[in-house]
């Protein structure tokens, strides 16, 4: 049996093809191919008579296998993310976007690939607020974001839909910012996703906090997503589709806010493409941050 140790550490764990496969798929390699590479790595270690191997040796061997198979960009990303995780730098990812655009799905996939255990939906924060704040005190949090305008009191000069949405966002943002502050303070990794992640309301604290705005490519795409969602959710598609105009008005507002605060806007058409864009953006920005500290995360092993 091959056992794996961290350099300078006495604790060893059995070599796992599953764990190595997951780390390879995190850079966009198909799971079947990733598993075959993991097997090749294991077979080569056995051939060399290795019973104890360091994580660095596994990384180097995996990197070489990716290069041999022509996956130069994937190899570069692999070595970057392995080194990044080894540094234990806290990473916070914020995902905003309109109702139904697929924020939760993207957040879950990112968490899996990056090994982040904490994924927080802003709807959960809103639900907590609903339990402790009565409708009489703050009525706009006790309804959907696209219907919050109906709870507004007084005259609204601009868009009532946006005004109602902002009212709910202002309340939920208090909880979002508190979570971000704690994560930064305690050095925790986290992904926060939800419609309430709005540029200018949510504080982007810490150099390793990244925000992205996910949007639907078209009205038809968003409508199709609502019907698709009924396959695994109790939420009826017709309810959301009947309010599609309001949802799209909020999307337009979110796009304007994202552009104003230089937040990347990503059309969420296909999961792999969206996840790859986010991970590539984080990688490039992190490389620049680390270069400023004299660290090269892309140096060949």
UniProtKB/Swiss-Prot annotation:
EC number(s)? Answer: 2.7.2.16
Please explain the role this protein plays, according to its UniProt record.
Answer: Catalyzes the phosphorylation of 2-phosphoglycerate to 2,3-diphosphoglycerate. Involved in the biosynthesis of cyclic 2,3-bisphosphoglycerate, a thermoprotectant.
Which EC main class describes this enzyme?
transferase
The Gene Ontology terms for molecular function here are: ATP binding; kinase activity; phosphotransferase activity, carboxyl group as acceptor
| SUPFAM superfamilies to which the protein is assigned, alphabetical | P-loop containing nucleoside triphosphate hydrolases
Q: Which PANTHER family match?
A: P-LOOP NTPASE DOMAIN-CONTAINING PROTEIN LPA1 HOMOLOG 1
Q: In which pathway does it act?
A: Thermoadapter biosynthesis; cyclic 2,3-diphosphoglycerate biosynthesis; cyclic 2,3-diphosphoglycerate from 2-phospho-D-glycerate: step 1/2
Where in this chain does the record put each ATP-cone domain? 2-89
Query: Reaction catalysed?
Result: (2R)-2-phosphoglycerate + ATP = (2R)-2,3-bisphosphoglycerate + ADP + H(+)
Protein name, entry field: 2-phosphoglycerate kinase
Obligatory cofactor(s)? a divalent metal cation
- The gene from which this protein is expressed is pgk2
What is the similarity comment for this entry?
A: Belongs to the 2-phosphoglycerate kinase family.
InterPro entries given in the database record: 2PKG, ATP-cone_dom, P-loop_NTPase
UniProt organism field: Pyrococcus horikoshii (strain ATCC 700860 / DSM 12428 / JCM 9974 / NBRC 100139 / OT-3)
Keyword set for this entry? ATP-binding, Kinase, Nucleotide-binding, Transferase
Q: Which domain of life is it from?
A: Archaea
């Amino acid at each position: 049996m091959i056992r794996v140790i961290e350099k300078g550490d006495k604790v060893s764990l059995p070599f796992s093809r599953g764990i190595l496969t997951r780390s390879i798929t995190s850079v966009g390699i198909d799971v079947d191919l990733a598993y075959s590479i993991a097997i090749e790595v294991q077979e080569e270690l056995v051939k060399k008579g290795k019973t104890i191997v360091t994580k660095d040796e596994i990384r180097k061997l995996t990197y070489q296998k990716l290069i041999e198979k022509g996956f130069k960009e994937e190899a570069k990303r692999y070595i970057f993310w392995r080194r990044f995780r080894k540094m234990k730098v806290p990473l916070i990812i914020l995902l905003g976007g309109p109702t139904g655009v697929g924020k939760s799905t993207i957040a879950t996939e990112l968490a899996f690939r990056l090994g982040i255990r904490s994924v927080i939906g802003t709807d959960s924060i809103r639900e907590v607020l609903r339990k402790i704040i009565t409708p009489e005190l703050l009525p706009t949090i006790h309804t959907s974001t696209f219907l919050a305008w109906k709870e507004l009191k007084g005259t609204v000069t601009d868009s009532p839909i946006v005004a109602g949405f902002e009212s709910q966002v202002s309340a939920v943002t208090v909880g979002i910012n508190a979570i971000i502050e704690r994560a930064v303070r305690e050095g925790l990794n986290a992904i926060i996703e939800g419609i309430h992640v709005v540029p200018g309301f949510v504080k982007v604290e810490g150099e390793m906090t990244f925000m992205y705005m996910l949007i639907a490519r078209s009205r038809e795409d968003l409508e199709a997503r609502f019907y698709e969602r009924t396959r695994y959710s109790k939420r009826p598609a017709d309810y959301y589709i009947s309010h599609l105009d309001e949802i799209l008005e909020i999307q337009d507002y979110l796009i304007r806010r994202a552009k104003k605060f230089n937040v990347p806007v990503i059309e969420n058409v296909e999961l792999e493409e969206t996840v790859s864009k986010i991970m590539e953006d984080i990688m490039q920005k992190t490389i620049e941050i680390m270069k400023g500290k004299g660290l090269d995360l892309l140096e060949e092993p």
